Amino acid sequence: MVDCDWSNLPEELLHMIVLLLFSVVELKRFRSICRSWRSSTSGVNRNNPFPSRPRIHFDPIDPSETLSSDDSYISRPGAFLSRAAFFRVTLSSSSSKGWMIKSDMDINSGRFRLLNVLSRYPLRLYSESIDLLEFTVSEIREAYTVLNTAKRRSATKGYQRSAPVKVKEGEGHRDGVLGIGRDGNINYWDGNVLSELKQMGDHFSDIIVHKGLINSDLEISRFGTSLDENITDGCWGDLRFVEGCGELYIVERLPKNTRKRKAGDFFHNSRTVGFKAYKMDEELAKWIEIKTLGDNAFLMGTDTCFSVLAHEVYGCLPNSIYYTENTWPKVCKLEDGNGSSIIVTMSESSKSSFEMFYPSFV
C-alpha cells in the first residue's frame, strides 16, 4: 500500500473538493483536517460556498395593511423566521449506522444549540462540542418556523406551518414566507406587507416546497387534485406532507374522536390512535393509500416531516411513524397490509426504539 501525504494535495484540487461540500458542518470538518486544507478556504468571500442566510424579520407594520385588527399578533416586534437543520451523525470509523440531531442558532449569542428532533424545544443537557475527527456530521434537511421571540419555541398563530419562498422583484428576487394559520388559511409575508390569500380558501393544514413547487394540502398545485374524501369519509385528521427518496407523501394522523373536518379545526389535541399514508399515483392522477412503508420510517416533526431508512439509524423501527403528542415522543408501528398499528410511548422499556434521538456524545 502506497502512503499518501494528504496535506500536500494541490490547492486546485482542494478548491474543487470544497465546492462539493453541502453544509457548514462539512466545511468545518474539512478545515479541521490540517493547516493546508484550512488555508485553502481562508478567503471567505471567494471560497466559502455557504454564506450566512439572511434572517427574515416580520417588522411591525401598519395594522391597516395586516390581515385584520384581530391578527395583530403577527406584527409584534421581534417575530422572525427561524431556521433549524437536521444532521445525521455517524462514527468516522463506521458509517453504516448513525443518530439524528437537530440544531438552530441562538440569535442573541450566535451559537449553535441542540434541539429535540421532533420539536423546537432545546435539549437541556448536551456536550458543548463534537469532535469532527471522531464523528462525521452530515446535514440532511432544514426546517423553518415563525417565532414571536427568540425565547418562545412555538410557532405563531398565523404561521403554524411555514415555507420560505423567493419573490420575483424586477430582475431579481427577495425573500418571502408562506404559512398556514390555526384557522386553516394561507398567509403571505412579502417582506413588507402581510396578506391573507383568501382566494385559496381555508382548508389547509400543511405546506411544503417540493422540487421547487409549492404544495399545500388539501389541494395539491402540482397535480391539481385533492385527497379523495371517499377514502376517509370526510373525517380528516391532521394532514402532513412527508418527503422521502424524492417522492411526496401525505400522512394523516387519526384522532380518537373523529369528526367532519372544517375550518378552524386543524390543530386539535385529540389522542392519536393511528396513521394512514398516501402517495400520488401520477398515471391515475390521484392519491392512493399505501399499506406499508417498507424499511422507511417517517419522522413527523412540528416544523417539517421526512423519511429515513431504518437500517441506517440506531434503534429505528422500519415501517413506522415517529411523532410527538403533548411533548412526549411516540412511535406508531404500522402492521403490514391490515391497516392496524401499535403505538409506543418512550419509556425505560421502549427506550431502544428512540435511540437515534439520543447520541452517545450528547
UniProtKB/Swiss-Prot annotation:
Superkingdom: Eukaryota
CDD domains listed in its UniProt record: F-box_SF
Any single Pfam family the record assigns to this protein: Beta-prop_KIB1-4
Transmembrane segments: none
Disulfide bonds: none
PANTHER family named in the record: F-BOX PROTEIN, F-BOX PROTEIN SKIP23
Record's protein name: Uncharacterized protein At1g65760
Organism: Arabidopsis thaliana (Mouse-ear cress)
